[in-house]
């Protein structure tokens, strides 16, 4: 995350901190007004620029030396990392989910009997409520990494070797998928589900905007493996950034309702769609392996990959009977308001 922090510092944060929290220089440091230049501020600064990576060098602007909080100040780093986590997360969410919604998501889903009234708006509101809270909990992990407590490395020479530059990607996916599988199963425990995970299962027929529409502690629990990985295993800095972008893209993709392939290895959109409608199957994030080992794998049926078949009213009616049974069994009652203004089956507590 120090690479991202350096980019944000160079183009945004240096200017903001210089303006809102300028350095107060003693009068005797500058004997004449002509000497009170930005260059002089650099000369009197104790902060020395060190690139976060050898692959990118960004010369700091003069404003980098003009704040009482220089780039190494932990409070400044914590605040900036919090804002990066929140705002960058929102940007990725809105850009990717919007593109997926416009170009991929099948709008016939709106006609599904279990599509909630004003669902897209509700998903966006839920995501916007969750992200700033998640950012508060997540930022300390990024701060520890920036402070050098993790196992992030820059070049091949700094890491285990060239072989690991390639091996780190499947290792990251397998480790995080294993951890998320068990975290996800825990979130479905009857004592936990209604408090943390029920919100995300409100969306039986999710749209791409449902990807981050969850309780903040739910989102943090399932993202925790991503954050602890670089404290346990070495991870190259640029790979770290790429993987975090990827996991956010993947979260949107598995909620877009476009079932491209019935792959027995990959836990794609079809598998995750079954998780939303069948609740206690397909807990994995990337692969089906841990669901198979844990006895929770449900293979998508062939009709799900036939576009017209999966959008047919006959298929919908057949499916919602099972969905409603599961809602009653797991949640006790259904307080969702569907597009037809009321659930087909009324439930009692």
UniProtKB/Swiss-Prot annotation:
TM segment ranges: 84-104, 124-144, 162-182, 227-247
InterPro entries, sorted: Fatty_acid_hydroxylase, Sterol_Desaturase_Related
Position of sequence motif Histidine box-1: 184-188
One Pfam family named in its UniProt record: FA_hydroxylase
GO molecular function terms noted in the UniProt entry: iron ion binding; oxidoreductase activity
Major place of residence: endoplasmic reticulum
Membrane topology: Multi-pass membrane protein
Pathway field: Steroid metabolism; ergosterol biosynthesis
Reaction(s) catalysed by this chain's protein: episterol + 2 Fe(II)-[cytochrome b5] + O2 + 2 H(+) = 5-dehydroepisterol + 2 Fe(III)-[cytochrome b5] + 2 H2O
Location within or outside the cell: Endoplasmic reticulum membrane
Keyword Transmembrane helix: yes
E.C. numbers: 1.14.19.20
Locus of motif Histidine box-3: 272-276
Entry annotated with the keyword Membrane: yes
Function (record text): The third module or late pathway involves the ergosterol synthesis itself through consecutive reactions that mainly occur in the endoplasmic reticulum (ER) membrane. Firstly, the squalene synthase ERG9 catalyzes the condensation of 2 farnesyl pyrophosphate moieties to form squalene, which is the precursor of all steroids.
Membership in a protein family: Belongs to the sterol desaturase family.
Entry text on domains: The histidine box domains may contain the active site and/or be involved in metal ion binding.
Protein name stated in the entry: Delta(7)-sterol 5(6)-desaturase ERG3A
Gene expressing this chain: ERG3A
């Amino acid at each position: 995350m120090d690479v991202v922090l350096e980019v944000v510092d160079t183009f945004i944060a240096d200017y903001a901190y210089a303006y809102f929290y300028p350095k107060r220089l003693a009068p005797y440091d500058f004997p004449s007004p002509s000497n009170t230049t930005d260059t002089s501020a650099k000369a009197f600064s104790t902060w020395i620029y060190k690139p976060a990576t050898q692959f990118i060098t960004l010369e700091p602007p003069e404003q980098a030396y003009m704040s009482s909080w220089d780039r190494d100040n932990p409070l400044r780093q914590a605040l900036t990392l919090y804002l990066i986590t929140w705002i960058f997360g929102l940007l990725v969410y809105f850009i990717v989910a919007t593109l997926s919604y416009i170009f991929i998501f099948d709008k016939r889903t709106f006609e599904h009997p279990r599509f909630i009234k004003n669902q897209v708006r509700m998903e966006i509101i839920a995501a916007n409520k969750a992200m700033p809270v998640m950012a508060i909990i997540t930022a300390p992990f990024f701060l520890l990494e920036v402070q050098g407590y993790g196992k992030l490395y820059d070049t091949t020479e700094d890491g285990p070797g060239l072989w690991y530059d390639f091996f780190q990607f499947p290792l990251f996916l397998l480790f995080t998928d294993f951890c998320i599988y068990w975290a996800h199963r825990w979130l479905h425990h009857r004592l936990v589900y209604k408090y943390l995970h029920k919100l995300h299962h409100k969306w039986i027929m999710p749209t791409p905007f449902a990807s981050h529409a969850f309780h903040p502690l739910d989102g943090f629990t399932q993202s925790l493996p991503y954050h602890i990985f670089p404290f346990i295993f070495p991870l190259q800095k640029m790979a770290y950034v790429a993987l975090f972008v990827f996991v956010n893209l993947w979260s949107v993709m598995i909620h877009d309702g476009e079932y491209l392939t019935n792959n027995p290895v990959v836990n794609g959109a079809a598998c995750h769609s079954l998780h939303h409608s069948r609740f206690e199957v397909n807990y994995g994030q990337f692969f089906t392996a841990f669901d198979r080992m844990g006895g929770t794998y449900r293979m998508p049926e062939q009709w799900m990959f036939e576009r017209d078949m999966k959008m047919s009213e006959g298929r919908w009616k057949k499916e919602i009977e099972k969905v409603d049974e599961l809602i009653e069994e797991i949640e006790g009652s259904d307080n969702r308001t569907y597009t037809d203004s009321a659930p087909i089956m009324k439930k009692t507590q």
